[in-house]
Amino acid sequence: YAAGRKQILNNPRTYGEVLWRPVDRRENYVKRCVGLPGDTLQIVDGQVMIDGKAIQNPENLQFNYFVQTTGPYIPEEMFRELGISNADRTLMEDSGYEIGLLEMGLDSRNAQGKLNPVYHLPLTKKMYDTLLGNKKLISKIIMEPEAYAGQMYPLNLYTKWDRNNYGPIWIPAKGATITLTPDNLPIYERCIVAYEGNKLEVKSD
């Protein structure tokens, strides 16, 4: 543990800046803020909407993809030119990945019957176009399926929200009130109990 910790702290260019989790959970680190108090946030087919209007996407907006080559590995020089760090890429070499890759249609094989190399990469549109245009090296590029996205807040199966279709969710503003219902309670319950420290009870009519 100590050796690994030292390795990470001493190599910020490789692993990035180490951010410590605050003791006060109300001061959590925010990587990207897209909505403010009083706004209604929604994501429709990957597009962030505020109060029903699409916001301007960042120039270097990234999505995760699975990239299969025609056989060779992607050269380190190309990764450097694209700006993809070693920490941001995963080579899916373990045989345990094969079923999932085949289900996505990443089925290109070499003469020995082994699947051609597949990478999991975060790509901007420019990176995507550059790779896709290299027909000698790149066989297929598939956007990461929702099943790989992990958990979404709130942890409630009934919302069926995912990272590309999320909400709408109203962001509470100071002094404003909202009527709690069985449908919206999962959204605000944790905020009320864990962050505001209030007691919440649901009573029958």
Label the predicted regions.
Residues 1-205:
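Soluble "head" domains of membrane/secretory-pathway proteins
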